[in-house]
């Protein structure tokens, strides 16, 4: 599989179940080690880096299955996401010196800004397990944004959302791109992807079968066959 993503764009990665989309995200974000090939980011080749190092470089992600700290508040979840940008370190956290306290206050302010950005500041002190499914998705996005990413990889962010929530999500992704953040999007809602992405790549059984503008991908016979079967495509 080979593709490139323009900085500041929204790039979609679609395909049937089991096509390898999430596996690709896991490779890009360091959860899986790739067997061969190269992964270049902003002019540098990234080889066998851990997820925390990749996050520190500017690549953040959300997960297909929501991974929040259920018994922590919304604001605490976002603050945890900010740890890759902290300077105090372990000893500063233990000593609780003035610099650490100042940094923690700045982290909390930034976390409130991000909750406001995703529309959740009014729920800042609510436990994440008490949020609706759609709000938990938005909270996970806020936590990823807390790392100040250059690239944000969203793995099925619209899963389980109703039509109203999907519309709000679409507006949020557009707003994220407006801040100069490149967005990688895995999503089964083809209508959402086609209306949102600048370019799309399609995977099937671990191979790329198409890439291009949304309208071109939508008409590609290989894509139609992958989704509907050879008889329908014919």
Q: Which residues fall in each region the model found?
A:
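Glycine-rich phosphate-binding loops of nucleotide-dependent enzymes
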Residues: 1-234
């Amino acid at each position: 599989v080979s593709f490139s993503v323009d900085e500041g764009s929204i790039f979609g990665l679609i395909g049937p179940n089991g096509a390898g989309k999430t596996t690709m995200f896991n490779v890009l974000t360091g959860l899986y080690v790739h067997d061969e090939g190269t992964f270049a980011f902003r002019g540098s080749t990234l080889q066998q880096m851990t997820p925390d190092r990749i996050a520190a470089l500017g690549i953040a992600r959300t997960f297909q299955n929501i991974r929040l700290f259920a018994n922590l508040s919304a604001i605490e979840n976002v603050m945890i996401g900010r740890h890759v940008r902290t300077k105090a370190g372990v000893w500063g956290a233990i000593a609780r010196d003035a610099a650490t306290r100042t940094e923690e206050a700045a982290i909390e302010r930034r976390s409130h800004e991000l909750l406001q950005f995703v529309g959740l500041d009014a729920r800042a002190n609510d436990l994440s397990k008490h949020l609706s499914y759609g709000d938990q998705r938005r909270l996970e996005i806020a936590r990823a944004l807390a790392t100040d990413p250059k690239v944000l990889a969203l793995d099925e962010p619209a899963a389980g959302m109703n039509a109203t929530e999907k519309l709000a999500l679409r507006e949020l992704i557009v707003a994220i791109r407006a801040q100069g953040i490149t967005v990688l999007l895995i999503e089964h809602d083809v209508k959402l992807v086609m209306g949102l992405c600048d370019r799309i790549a399609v995977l099937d059984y671990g191979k790329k079968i198409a890439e291009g503008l949304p309208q071109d991908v939508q008409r590609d016979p290989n894509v139609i066959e992958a989704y509907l079967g050879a008889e329908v495509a014919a």
